[in-house]
Amino acid sequence: MAKRSLASLNAGDLSGKRVLVRVDFNVPLNEAGAITDDTRIRAALPTINDLIGKGAKVILSAHFGRPKGQVNDAMRLTPVAARLSELLGKPVAKTDSCIGPDAEAKVNAMADGDVVLLENVRFFAEEEKNDAGFAEKLAGLAEVYVNDAFGAAHRAHASTEGVTKFLKPAVAGFLMEKELQYLQGAVDEPKRPLAAIVGGSKVSSKIGVLEALIDKCDKVLIGGGMIFTFYKARGLSVGKSLVEEDKLELAKELEAKAKAKGVELLLPTDVVLADNFAPDANSQVADVTAIPDGWMGLDIGPDAVKVFQDALGDCQTVIWNGPMGVFEFEKFATGTNAIATTLAELSGKGCCTIIGGGDSVAAVEKAGLADKMSHISTGGGASLELLEGKVLPGVAALNDAA
């Protein structure tokens, strides 16, 4: 069921109203406490600016890091408030706590169009427990609820799910709406052929996604460290490459399932090997049937790249989740960069390219190709769960569209 969106609320609905907006401001900081990537803050600007323009009092709620229900000064949202203020070109007041006297005083002092950022909601253990009393206090600051934190939508927490019991309407922000349109659309009503590229080191973390995608896709391309579990399941020697011994049967089952459904399941034909796990390791390219002892695979090989590019050539929708190799090491980033370049070219030809969160986003940004993709998801775990066909609690809690 489609969810009600912020677009359905006009200035008459919002002017002078206190609006609680759950955002995803979980940004990386360096050792000096400075933000190194403000993508998530910028992603929330359309929703925040729309509310400011409609005369709302904008109360932002966010988490940062994993403080485990304790106040941790290193995880305060102070640098986020400063950066948001720069991006909005107006002051952003930050509260000392997300509930209590200081939060109430700062909210009560707001004029229409003002913005207040509540302190890290995870300083309270009740947030992750979805405690009703805590949710009611948080909701008590506002009259309307907007969830724009897709990256936290797979969590049933007080600020994502609990508050919706006390605030009406409860609607999706523009970022949330865009994520749902692209990710659900890709799975439910894709332009075909639909291909998924799944990478990463472990089969175990992508089991649900692989099973769901084999059900829905025309082609599934697998890269990253997880390929060696598939090779070993086929009886091949993999040297000292990463293998999940307890997932060998599952790998066989996934291959059999794809075959039975007529889905093209592609594994790399060659790999780039290293003699140890290091950026300056000695390397060689080998066919997957001839991996020598003592070597480990850290990237897909040049032939595999060509085969993957050919397979993607006629696709109208491509979902990518997980790198092809250890792209943090320049020597073993070639496969990942080649896939990023291929998807950028396909986008230019009208293919819908969706980068499904996590490391693939970092890889695309590192390659300087982020603006060439149709959609880059801001949620790692949330995008995986949505692709698996799971219901996201933070989405389910919102009002249905009329």
UniProtKB/Swiss-Prot annotation:
Catalytic activity entry: (2R)-3-phosphoglycerate + ATP = (2R)-3-phospho-glyceroyl phosphate + ADP
Annotated CDD domains: Phosphoglycerate_kinase (cd00318)
Signal sequence, start to end: none
EC number of this enzyme: 2.7.2.3
Keyword flag Cytoplasm: yes
Compartment(s) where it occurs, according to its Swiss-Prot or TrEMBL record: Cytoplasm
An example Gene Ontology CC term for this record: cytosol
Entry keywords, A to Z: ATP-binding, Cytoplasm, Glycolysis, Kinase, Nucleotide-binding, Transferase
Pathway: Carbohydrate degradation; glycolysis; pyruvate from D-glyceraldehyde 3-phosphate: step 2/5
A molecular function GO annotation: ADP binding
Entry binding sites for ATP: K206, G297, E328, G357, G358, D359, S360
Pfam families referenced in this protein's UniProt entry, alphabetically: PGK
GO biological process: gluconeogenesis; glycolytic process
Binding annotation for substrate: D24, F25, N26, R40, H63, F64, G65, R66, R122, R155
UniProt keyword Nucleus present: no
InterPro entries: Phosphoglycerate_kinase, Phosphoglycerate_kinase_CS, Phosphoglycerate_kinase_N, Phosphoglycerate_kinase_sf
HAMAP family: Phosphoglyc_kinase
Record's subunit section: Monomer.
Name this protein carries in UniProt: Phosphoglycerate kinase
Originating species: Parasynechococcus marenigrum (strain WH8102)
Origin organism lineage: Bacteria, Bacillati, Cyanobacteriota, Cyanophyceae, Synechococcales
